[in-house]
C-alpha cells in the first residue's frame, strides 16, 4: 500500500488574513493542521542597528514604526528607558498626559484588532463599526501632535507640548457641504479635553453595540470557542504576555504589577479569562477597552484641575520654549546644539517595559556615554506570541488558523523590526 503523505500548503504572505507579511508553511493531513511553521523577516528594516547611528532623540520616530497600530506606547517604553539611564524626573502633568494617550492608543489598537478579527472570521460589519470610533481617536492624536498615526509626541522628560485649548474643526470642501460639516463639528467646539470627555461618555454604549453583534452570536462562538486553547502553565512557559496570558487566567499586567508613570493612582480592573481559548481572549480585550475608557476619564478630570509644565526643566534634555528661542541668541544656540548634537547619556544600561496593547513591550538600552545608544534591544510581544502559533494550531482545521492568527493580534512592524 502506498504511503500516505501530508500535504504542504503555503499560507501568505499575500493572504488577506495574514496581517501584514506573515508566511506560514502548513503541513496538513486532509484539512487538519499537523504543523505550522511561521517564516518571518519580510518586513525587517534594521531598526535596532539604525538606532546605533542616530542620536537618542532622532531614534524616537522609529519607535512609532515598530508596532504601527500602537504608536505612542512604543514611544513610552523608549522614553522610560532613557529617563531611567539619566535619572530624569518627569513632571506630574506630563505623566498624566502620557498615561491618557497610552490608553487612547490601547483603544486604537483594540478597535483595529476587533474589526480585523471579526472580518477574518466572517463578521464583515465589525470593521465599519470599529473604524467609526477610530476616526475620533485619530483626531485626538492629530490635535496634540499634528499627525494622525506616527505622532512622535512623547519626549525623554515629558511630552512635546501641552494639550490644545481649541479642537481642530472640519472645513467645508468640495465633497462635504456646510450642513455635513456642522454635524461633524458639533462636539469640536471646545478644547481637546472636552472632545475626549464627549468620547468617553459615548464609548461604553458603543462597546455594547459591538458585543450585541458578536458576544452571543452563534457563528462567532462556533469560530472561537475551544480554538487555540492555552493552559496557564503553557502560556507562562511560552513567554506570552498581555491579553494572551490574561486570557488563560493569569492576572499579569505591568500597569498593576510594575506600575510606571501614574498608573499606581488609577482605579481599574484586570480582566482575565477562564478557558484560555480564542473566545476568552476576545472577551478580555473587549473588557480592556472599557477599563481603558475609565483610565482616560480619570486622567482627563485630573488634567482639568491641575495645570503645570509638561516637560522636565533639565535643559540638557529639554529644548527652550519657542518664545525664548526667538528672543535670545543663547537659547537659539542651545536649541541648535540639542537637535544637531543631541544629549549625552551617562554610561550604563537600563530596561524599561510598558503594558503595550499586545503585551510586554520592552526597550533595553546600553549607553557608553555618547549621544547615541551603544546598543538598543527591542522586546516585541508579538515575537513570542507568533512562536506559540505551532502549538496553538495543531489539530485544528485550516479555517481555524485564521482565527488563531487573529486572536494573537500580531503586527509585523515589531516582530521583524
Swiss-Prot record:
Topology with respect to the bilayer: Peripheral membrane protein
GO cellular component terms, A-Z: plasma membrane
Subcellular location: Cell inner membrane
Enzymatic reactions: a quinone + NADH + 5 H(+)(in) = a quinol + NAD(+) + 4 H(+)(out)
GO molecular function, one term: quinone binding
Keyword list, A-Z: Cell inner membrane, Cell membrane, Membrane, NAD, Quinone, Translocase, Transport, Ubiquinone
Matches recorded under Pfam families: Complex1_49kDa
EC number: 7.1.1.-
Organism superkingdom: Bacteria
Gene3D superfamilies: Cytochrome-c3 Hydrogenase, chain B (1.10.645.10)
Described function: NDH-1 shuttles electrons from NADH, via FMN and iron-sulfur (Fe-S) centers, to quinones in the respiratory chain. The immediate electron acceptor for the enzyme in this species is believed to be ubiquinone. Couples the redox reaction to proton translocation (for every two electrons transferred, four hydrogen ions are translocated across the cytoplasmic membrane), and thus conserves the redox energy in a proton gradient.
Binding partners and assembly: NDH-1 is composed of 14 different subunits. Subunits NuoB, C, D, E, F, and G constitute the peripheral sector of the complex.
HAMAP family in alphabetical order: NDH1_NuoD (MF_01358)
Entries under PANTHER family matching the protein: NADH DEHYDROGENASE [UBIQUINONE] IRON-SULFUR PROTEIN 2, MITOCHONDRIAL, NADH-UBIQUINONE OXIDOREDUCTASE 49 KDA SUBUNIT
Family to which this protein belongs: Belongs to the complex I 49 kDa subunit family.
Protein name: NADH-quinone oxidoreductase subunit D
Species, as recorded: Leptothrix cholodnii (strain ATCC 51168 / LMG 8142 / SP-6) (Leptothrix discophora (strain SP-6))
Amino acid at each position: 500500500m502506498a504511503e500516505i503523505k501530508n500535504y504542504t500548503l503555503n499560507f501568505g504572505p499575500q493572504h488577506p488574513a495574514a496581517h501584514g507579511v506573515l508566511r506560514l508553511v502548513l503541513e496538513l493531513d486532509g484539512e487538519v493542521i499537523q504543523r505550522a511553521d511561521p517564516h518571518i523577516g519580510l518586513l525587517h528594516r534594521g531598526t535596532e542597528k539604525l538606532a546605533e547611528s542616530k542620536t537618542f532623540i532622532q531614534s524616537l520616530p522609529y519607535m512609532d514604526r515598530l508596532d504601527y497600530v500602537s504608536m505612542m506606547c512604543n514611544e513610552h517604553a523608549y522614553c522610560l528607558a532613557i529617563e531611567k539611564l539619566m535619572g530624569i524626573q518627569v513632571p506630574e502633568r506630563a505623566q498624566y498626559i502620557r498615561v491618557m494617550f497610552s490608553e487612547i492608543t490601547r483603544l486604537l489598537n483594540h478597535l483595529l484588532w476587533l474589526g480585523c478579527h471579526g472580518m477574518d472570521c466572517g463578521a464583515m460589519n465589525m470593521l465599519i463599526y470599529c473604524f467609526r470610533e477610530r476616526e475620533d481617536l485619530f483626531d485626538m492624536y492629530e490635535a496634540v501632535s499634528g499627525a494622525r498615526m506616527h505622532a512622535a509626541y512623547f519626549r525623554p522628560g515629558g511630552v512635546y507640548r501641552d494639550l490644545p485649548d481649541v479642537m481642530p474643526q472640519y472645513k467645508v470642501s468640495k465633497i462635504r457641504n456646510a450642513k455635513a460639516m456642522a454635524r461633524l463639528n458639533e462636539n469640536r467646539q471646545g478644547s481637546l479635553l472636552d472632545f475626549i470627555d464627549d468620547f468617553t461618555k459615548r464609548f461604553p454604549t458603543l462597546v455594547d453595540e459591538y458585543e450585541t453583534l458578536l458576544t452571543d452570536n452563534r457563528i462567532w462562538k462556533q469560530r472561537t470557542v475551544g480554538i487555540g486553547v492555552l493552559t496557564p502553565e503553557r502560556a507562562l512557559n511560552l513567554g506570552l504576555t498581555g491579553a494572551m496570558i490574561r486570557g488563560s487566567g493569569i492576572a499579569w499586567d505591568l500597569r498593576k504589577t510594575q506600575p510606571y508613570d501614574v498608573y499606581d493612582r488609577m482605579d481599574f480592573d484586570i480582566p482575565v479569562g477562564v478557558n484560555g481559548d480564542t473566545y476568552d481572549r476576545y472577551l478580555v480585550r473587549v473588557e480592556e477597552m472599557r477599563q481603558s475608557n475609565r483610565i482616560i476619564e480619570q486622567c482627563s478630570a485630573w488634567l482639568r484641575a491641575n495645570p503645570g509644565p509638561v516637560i522636565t526643566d533639565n535643559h540638557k534634555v529639554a529644548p527652550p520654549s519657542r518664545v525664548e528661542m526667538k528672543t535670545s541668541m543663547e537659547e537659539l544656540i542651545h536649541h541648535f546644539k540639542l537637535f544637531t548634537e543631541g544629549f549625552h547619556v551617562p554610561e550604563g544600561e537600563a530596561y524599561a517595559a510598558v503594558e503595550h496593547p499586545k503585551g510586554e513591550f520592552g526597550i533595553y538600552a546600553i549607553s557608553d556615554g555618547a549621544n547615541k545608544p551603544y546598543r538598543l534591544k527591542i522586546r516585541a510581544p508579538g515575537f513570542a506570541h507568533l512562536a506559540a502559533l505551532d502549538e496553538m494550531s495543531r489539530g485544528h482545521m485550516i479555517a481555524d488558523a485564521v482565527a488563531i492568527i487573529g486572536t494573537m493580534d500580531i503586527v509585523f512592524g515589531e516582530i521583524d523590526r
